[in-house]
């Protein structure tokens, strides 16, 4: 079995994850709820997240999250990176899932997918 054979992407789980996280208000400098939820999700995966003091330095309410997963393999470590914030208008986001597989906002806010999709890929 190859590594590719072991990869199992669960589309329903990804869509549900996107729906949940996209609905969290996380405009720049106001990512506290998103940071707390991501810490919970990382903990569910056995990853302890640490938060730095960036919030204090920039006038925000959440710092950067760092999680380390030790897998016991030799080789070069890799870094996965994403951001938690969205641009305005991003309060009260409502993702709309279309039959063709696309996801859009309801038109009253941004969708906030620019890096939420990256965050979800990291969680997956």
Question: Which ranges hold each PLM region?
Answer:
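N-terminal capping segment at the start of a domain
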Residues: 2-32
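Hydrophobic alpha-helical segments, principally membrane-spanning helices and signal/leader peptides
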Residues: 4, 8-10, 68-70, 103
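Active-site metal-coordination/substrate-binding segment of hydrolases
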Residues: 61, 68, 74-124
